[in-house]
Structures are given as C-alpha cells and as structure tokens.
Amino acid sequence: MRPERPRPRGSAPGPMETPPWDPARNDSLPPTLTPAVPPYVKLGLTVVYTVFYALLFVFIYVQLWLVLRYRHKRLSYQSVFLFLCLFWASLRTVLFSFYFKDFVAANSLSPFVFWLLYCFPVCLQFFTLTLMNLYFTQVIFKAKSKYSPELLKYRLPLYLASLFISLVFLLVNLTCAVLVKTGNWERKVIVSVRVAINDTLFVLCAVSLSICLYKISKMSLANIYLESKGSSVCQVTAIGVTVILLYTSRACYNLFILSFSQNKSVHSFDYDWYNVSDQADLKNQLGDAGYVLFGVVLFVWELLPTTLVVYFFRVRNPTKDLTNPGMVPSHGFSPRSYFFDNPRRYDSDDDLAWNIAPQGLQGGFAPDYYDWGQQTNSFLAQAGTLQDSTLDPDKPSLG
C-alpha cells in the first residue's frame, strides 16, 4: 500500500474536512460558538433581580399603607421618600420582568418606555439624594432656630434651590435621550455631556450631604431632635456615609471612564454606567456578560442605597412608646406626633434643654406636633403646686 502524500498547504480541503477559520474574512465563522453566560445562569440572575426589587416594592407599599393606618401626615418627608422609592422599585421590577420572556425585546422598546425603564430610575435616585440634603439641612435649621431664629427664613430659598437642581437633572437626561433617539447628533458627545453634568451634580450633592452630617454630629440639639424622631446621630451618620460613598464611587467611576475613554488600556464595563439605554441602543442588544454586570452594578449602586433610605424612613407603630412605663405621663404625645419611635427618647433630662419650640417647627417634618416648652413648663408648674400644697396645708390649692 502506497503511503498517502501530505496535501500541499495551499490546496483546497477535502470534502470531509473543515475549512480553517480566517479572521480576516467576514463570511468565515469561528470553529465553535459558546455563550458568554449559560442560559440557566442568566435566568437565575433574572429571577434573583426581579425578586429583590419586587420584595422592596411590597415592603415600601406596606410602609405607605401604614402611614394611612397610623394617621400620619400624608404629605411629609417620609411619604415623599417612600413614594419615590416605590416608583423606583416598580420600574426596576418591570424592567427585569421583560427579560423572562424576550431578552432582545427588552432592549428594543419604544424611546419613551426605554428611557422610563433604564434612565429615569437614576433621576429618582438623584431626587432622593436631594431630598436627603433638604431633610438634614432642616434638622440643622431646627436645632439652631432656638438661638438663631432668622435661619428659618432660608427655608423657602432652600426648597426652590433643591427643586431647581432636580429639574435640571431631569431635563438634562430627558433632552439627551431625545437627541440620541431622534436627532442626528453625535451620540458619544451627547453621552459625555450628560454624564459630566449628572455626575457633577451627584458629587456636589454628596459633598453637601457630608457637610450636613458633620454639622449634625457636632450639635447636641440636633442629637436631641433626632432622638425625638426615634433615630440617633450614629444611625444617621452610618446610613448617610454609606449612601455618600456608594453614590460618589459610582459618579467618580463614570467620570474617570469618561475622561480616559480614549485610552485603550482603560477597560470599562460593557456599558456606560447609568447611560445603559444609549449603550444598549448602539449594540441593539445587551450582551450576556453586560447583562450580568448590569444587574450587579444596579444591585450595589442602586438597590443597596435605596434599601438603606427606605429603612431609615420606615413607619413604626406610634402607640408602642405610649405603654412604656418609663415615660413621663405629662410628656405624652399624640400618636400622630412623630414617625420615628425610640423607647429611649425621654430617658435623659437633657431633652428638657430644648424647651422652646421654634416658630415654624410644625411645618417641616412628618407629622410635627412639638410643644415641648409648654408641656414641660405645665408639668413643672403642676408638680410645684402639688408640692407646695403638701408642705403647707393652709395654702389654698390652685387645682
């Protein structure tokens, strides 16, 4: 039997041979194609993401129902925070529910629906960050209003400034999304402008919030006020610092990638931070690896800080402290007078130091009904009268 001579290197392959893959040819395919993520992993992650957001949605919905159940003030910092977080959780739940049925259709929605599901939740998170700045700034104002009542006149400008910043953030996102979808503008330029403006506002709000937390930690009256709300400086500082670090790290990452996007050695995620809608539109489909990173980033940079905010503004039973045997009877408040409960709120006599209710104190927090000075002075006056009557039987009693 004659040995088969080797085929020349340039000859055509035989009928049973697989042609070698030539990466220079567009019509050639690699020998094997495997998905970046197995389908069952992607389905499992979709289930986990959807369940987490759905549970948060149910929890916030229960909190809003408790606001009505306990007859708290309906329009308050607490209710607005919870409503924003409820809207955010609902949008994220709907977004991930799309991936159960059609992975491609979730990235090819109509322009408005696409912006609503992908970009608008970040706007809602910025609104919550702005509202946290407004909340803690008012804590400082109310703590200082006893000695500096003129600070209360700055509340209206503070409201207007917060509203203006929120509107700027919303309009920038909406305008850039419309230009990307309908205009002939350079998408990279639009994305860069939006990222630069949005992340700068995020960083500025985070810096402002850190300054507020620092001032609160140095003010004893602010500590008393937070104790009356069922919170404490340590709790406020821990939650605030965590939220600041998460939002700031997200913004700094995006600004870093934006600044060094021309550097080929710098590798970013499979998409531009919260401009996921633009990046997915350019690719027409979010890849498997990009989908995993998308869920992880949303979990760390969105779900975690939102959960902390919801925990801080959760609704508690206002009647729980009324049965506390250590509470002074004359300090009894209406069940509608607060939405933070703290069994230790009157353990210290230092709480009586804030015995003058500043003007306008009832209008800022939910629901505020603090006549600390009147109730304290009334209690002390009655106690003094009873003591005098006991020591001097001939002295007529005023009661």
Curated annotation (Swiss-Prot):
Gene Ontology CC: lysosomal membrane; membrane; plasma membrane
Database matches in CDD domains: 7tm_GPR137B
Entry-listed glycosylation sites: N26, N263, N275
Oligomeric and partner information: Interaction with RRAGA; increases RRAGA recruitment to lysosomes. Interacts with MTOR; this interaction is amino acid sensitive.
Positions of the UniProt region annotated as Disordered: 1-22
Protein name: Integral membrane protein GPR137B
Residues on Lumenal side: 1-46, 101-111, 181-188, 259-292
Residues that span the membrane, as ranges: 47-67, 80-100, 112-132, 160-180, 189-209, 238-258, 293-313
